Amino acid sequence: MANYTAADVKALREATGAGMLDCKKALDESQGDYDKAVEYLRIKGAKNVSKRAEREATEGLIAVSGNTMVEINCETDFVAKNEAFKSFASKIAEAAGEAKVNSGEELNNLEIDGKKVSEVVDEESAKTGEKLQARRAVTIEGDNVAVYLHQRSADLPPAVGVLVSYEGNAEGAHAVALQIAAMNAEYLTREDIPAEIVEKEREIAEATTREEGKPEAALPKIVEGRLNGFYKSVVLLEQASLSDSKKTVKQVADEAGTTITGFVRYEVGA
């Protein structure tokens, strides 16, 4: 006969986040001793961490604190929308914001309550039974930073996050943040694109134009046209504005009295 009650199982679940069957087994193994049951679950969880490490963690959330943004991953949206997971991620984001961390390595080496984030993540992973990951972090410089977090559905946490540093009008910066979230710009200006990427696009444009049998004399003009199309797709300030497709993002921002000085976009799993 079991020497524990349903209330004991419930208390153990709430304290550890482990599943009901795991909690029952822990209480069985510990003969109803609560503290030993907690220890059993911690050991069991630690043993399973290496197995979880081989799995993919492509769900999760984006969180922002101050000028710092982090991505925390899990395996399923079931865990992603769990309040305990969201609270856990928020705690990491707050610590990252205070320390102004700027990489995944810095994030995982950051200490919270005397433990590295990587250790805290492993402990939380043991509770959830899923692989968890503090994947990356970035801090954007600037006195004025607009933040936008996008939820794909009302019951899920933000899956896309944008930070925009700017000067001038805040509403204009917010509109640009929405643009970045939706259109996934990669660079602020064309000058920010690495030369090797531009050269590769030029080579592709030339090869495509020749494959189409266009006259050699027309080649330079056609290639430049295709390169301009590439710029309009990846350069934020050259994209067509979502609020007025006849104008570029730069034109609309200028009219609003906003100057964009930098941005970062995160998307869960991307």
From Swiss-Prot:
Q: Which Pfam families match?
A: EF_TS
**Which residues does the annotated region (Involved in Mg(2+) ion dislocation from EF-Tu) include?**
76-79
In alphabetical order, the GO MF annotations are: translation elongation factor activity
Q: Which GO terms describe its cellular component?
A: cytoplasm
Q: Where in the cell is it found?
A: Cytoplasm
Q: Which InterPro entries match?
A: EF-Ts_dimer_sf, Transl_elong_EFTs/EF1B, Transl_elong_EFTs/EF1B_dimer, Transl_elong_Ts_CS, UBA-like_sf
Keyword field: Cytoplasm, Elongation factor, Protein biosynthesis
Could you tell me which SUPFAM superfamilies the record lists for this protein? Elongation factor Ts (EF-Ts), dimerisation domain, UBA-like
Q: What is its main location?
A: cytoplasm
NCBIfam families per UniProt: tsf
**Similarity comment:** Belongs to the EF-Ts family.
The record's function comment reads: Associates with the EF-Tu.GDP complex and induces the exchange of GDP to GTP. It remains bound to the aminoacyl-tRNA.EF-Tu.GTP complex up to the GTP hydrolysis stage on the ribosome.
Protein name listed in UniProt: Elongation factor Ts
Instruction: Please tell me the species this chain comes from.
Output: Corynebacterium aurimucosum (strain ATCC 700975 / DSM 44827 / CIP 107346 / CN-1) (Corynebacterium nigricans)
